[in-house]
């Protein structure tokens, strides 16, 4: 119920299969050396953390965090270090804090990348994270944070 970003901040997230499809499409495009093409959700399909909260709650069949959420500093999270196992289950507290610091720093940037060039090349719009978050919840159900991190940080 606490993290570094605001619930109104947005995040630019795409599914890995969309990224793979875009990369395959780009292999057949005549791009100039050094030309940049962002594979991203873009402004239109990025989502607010408040939207993620509601979609996660629906997927988990529980109430959203909503008004109970508090935007806090990293120092506050460090002070909560001993509570992390109660929140996330068995985990390495130090590694969790490091991950929260890295992800939190990115999330607070509230960055969205322009995918206009990619879309103009014929790539369809990506799905919004909230459109497939239920699949993410289902495929990670029963996995601890360390088990998920083992896959994420290979």
Label every model-predicted segment.
Residues 15-18, 40-45, 117:
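Short, flexible loop/turn elements at secondary-structure junctions
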């Amino acid at each position: 119920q606490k993290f570094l970003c605001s619930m109104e901040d947005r995040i630019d997230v795409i599914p890995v299969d969309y990224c793979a499809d875009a990369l395959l499409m780009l292999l057949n495009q005549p791009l100039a050396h050094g030309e940049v093409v962002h594979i991203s959700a873009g402004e239109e399909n990025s989502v607010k953390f408040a939207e993620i909260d509601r979609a996660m709650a629906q997927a988990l069949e529980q109430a959203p965090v909503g008004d109970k959420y508090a935007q806090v500093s990293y120092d506050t999270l460090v002070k909560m270090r001993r509570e992390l196992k109660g929140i996330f289950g068995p985990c390495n507290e130090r590694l969790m804090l490091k991950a929260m610091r890295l992800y939190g720093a990115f999330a607070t940037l509230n960055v969205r990348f322009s995918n206009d060039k990619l879309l103009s090349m014929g790539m369809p719009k990506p799905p919004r994270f909230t459109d497939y978050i239920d699949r993410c919840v289902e495929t990670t159900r029963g996995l601890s944070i360390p088990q998920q991190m083992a896959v994420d940080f290979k």
